[in-house]
Amino acid sequence: TGGNVEMSGSVTGNDTGIALTGAQIHAGAGKVALTGVSSSGKGIVVDSATTVDTRSVDLRTDTIDLQGTITGDGDSDGSVTVRTFTGDRIINFGTGSGGLDLAGNTFSSAGKIQGFKKNIVGDAAKKSNIKAGGVTADNNLVLSSAAGKITVSGAVTVAAGHGLTLASKDSVEGAGVITADAVNLDAADAVVRLTGTHAIQKLDGKAKELAFKNSADLVVGGETGLTIGAGGANIAVTAGDLT
């Protein structure tokens, strides 16, 4: 009914690390943290009869089956993080299988996680390779791969009024198209080559090297600045102004 909720489970074989079956968790302004590990089965299973209401949530697992709903309270400080338990794993977001697999609409009104002002996939302190395509998000979205690679293989669409942060110490690449009000690069040590023709309004952050193309007016560095390393930058717009 309120406060923080923490659960963890670790099993071998095909059993489930944490299974929420018909559970009703109401944490109010608190945080729900679930850590589930299974050597061959699912780390975390949330069945369709389960509902979780909370301000913040942290799901830490290498495999997940998410059928129930996890709902934020809409507070400006609220966030949800979905990240791997083990380092050097793959996160498939909207495309692919065989890793920590998330539906592309996970953070939208049509998905299972709703109402959080910040939606984070990955962990800034633990390497993962993130592949994203066919993704829609209703609020701010962060992809964070630490020393791993982010591949934008298909469309990544963030609702109007919100932005996408790409955080990597390795590389950010792909031909998928990003649609968002803003893109922020947390990639001072990474080569960023995004070859799709994107539909954003603002580009800020840091990258070691940058290639980026936009389909309309683009303001570069207007919010927090844009710092590019020795690799230089190639930024173009196919229509409109670059300022």
Predicted regions and their residues:
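Extracellular lectin-like interaction modules
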Residues: T1-T243
